[in-house]
């Protein structure tokens, strides 16, 4: 095509000559423009944000940080289960440290165990204390329910919960 041919084609104002208009596509159904004005893509629905469900009871856990906090916990009350061991000391607020060594597995597996333990501790509604939870290598094989029961058992043995 030469420039002469392009200049010879009349171009409608504001439309790209390469793309067919909505009325020119033979596959397009009649009235399709009206459907777009309703439903999830409607102009009034585009600005609205989806509402999040309310958070589960318990809220976010505060992490135990610093070597000194972990050192103090060595003298704390202890409890042990099949998959975890716990140590705790009374404190003005609940702080949790979760330790999952490389013996448990690669990073993906360790993070999965940590996520499960955080959720379990959040759901247990623990009293104010500094708490250390150390996962054993067997924790990678445990189901969520087994891990939950084991953490609860270890916390009962240590005296943190009844």
Swiss-Prot record:
GO cellular component term of the entry, any: ribonuclease P complex
Metal-binding as UniProt keyword? no
Which keywords are on file for this protein?
Endonuclease, Hydrolase, Nuclease, RNA-binding, tRNA processing
From the UniProt entry, list the residue stretches annotated as the region Disordered. Answer: 1-67
- A Pfam family matched by this chain, by name? Ribonuclease_P
Cross-referenced InterPro entries:
Ribosomal_Su5_D2-typ_SF, Ribsml_uS5_D2-typ_fold_subgr, RNase_P, RNase_P_CS
Q: Which E.C. number(s) belong to this protein? A: 3.1.26.5
Q: Name one GO molecular function term.
A: tRNA binding
Q: Which residue ranges have biased composition labelled Basic and acidic residues? A: 21-31
What do we know about how this protein assembles, alone or with others? Consists of a catalytic RNA component (M1 or rnpB) and a protein subunit.
Further comment found in the protein's record: The open reading frame (ORF) for this protein entirely encompasses the ORF for the 50S ribosomal protein L34 (rpmH). The two start codons are separated by four nucleotides.
NCBIfam families in the record, alphabetically?
rnpA
Q: What HAMAP family does UniProt report for this protein, alphabetically?
A: RNase_P (MF_00227)
Described function: RNaseP catalyzes the removal of the 5'-leader sequence from pre-tRNA to produce the mature 5'-terminus. It can also cleave other RNA substrates such as 4.5S RNA. The protein component plays an auxiliary but essential role in vivo by binding to the 5'-leader sequence and broadening the substrate specificity of the ribozyme.
Family recorded in the similarity comment: Belongs to the RnpA family.
Provide the protein name. Answer: Ribonuclease P protein component
Q: Which organism is it from?
A: Thermus brockianus
Quote the gene name from the UniProt entry. Answer: rnpA
């Amino acid at each position: 095509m030469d420039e002469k041919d392009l200049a010879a084609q009349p171009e409608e104002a504001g439309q790209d000559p390469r793309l067919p208009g909505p009325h020119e596509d033979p596959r397009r159904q009649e009235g399709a423009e009206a459907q777009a004005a309703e439903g999830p893509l409607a102009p009034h629905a585009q600005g609205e944000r989806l509402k999040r469900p309310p958070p589960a009871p318990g809220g976010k856990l505060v992490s135990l940080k610093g070597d000194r906090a972990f050192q103090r916990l060595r003298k704390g009350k202890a409890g042990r289960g099949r998959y975890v061991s716990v140590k705790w000391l009374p404190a003005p607020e609940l702080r949790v440290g979760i330790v999952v060594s490389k013996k448990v597995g690669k990073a993906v597996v360790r993070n999965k165990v940590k996520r499960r333990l955080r959720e379990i501790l959040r759901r247990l509604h623990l009293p104010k204390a500094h708490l250390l939870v150390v996962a054993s290598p067997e924790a990678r094989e445990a189901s969520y329910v087994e891990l939950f029961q084991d953490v609860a058992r270890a916390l009962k043995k240590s005296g943190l919960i009844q």
